[in-house]
Amino acid sequence: MYAVLTTGGKQYRVQEGDVLFVEKLNAEVDSTVELTEVLAVAKDGEIKVGAPVVEGAKVVAKVLAQGKAKKVVVFKYKRKKDYRRKNGHRQPYTKIVIEKIEA
């Protein structure tokens, strides 16, 4: 059994037990979150596709950690003009494990 869900503007194909790094969710570590935007569910060879979401379907996940990704360095410059700007960005993420798919 698997499900296709959307969170943080991205889509993920998940099964029970999968560990994901998703865009930051407002949840405490070791708490559970319900992801209700389930686009498709496959069970016993039968695929149910929502329009746009599957009615009554949800994915229950447990938050393992909150953190920041590796730093991305943004360096802008204009040649011959002594213009240089160095900037860094670390995207926050949430590490979750899929506990249950309900459909």
Curated annotation (Swiss-Prot):
Transmembrane segments annotated in the record for this chain: none
Keyword check for Cell inner membrane: no
PROSITE patterns: RIBOSOMAL_L21
One protein family per Pfam: Ribosomal_L21p
InterPro entries for this protein: bL21-like (IPR028909), bL21-like_sf (IPR036164), Ribosomal_bL21 (IPR001787), Ribosomal_bL21_CS (IPR018258)
Similarity comment: Belongs to the bacterial ribosomal protein bL21 family.
Family annotation (NCBIfam families): L21 (TIGR00061)
Physiological role: This protein binds to 23S rRNA in the presence of protein L20.
Protein name listed in UniProt: Large ribosomal subunit protein bL21
Provenance organism: Clostridium perfringens (strain 13 / Type A)
Name of the gene: rplU
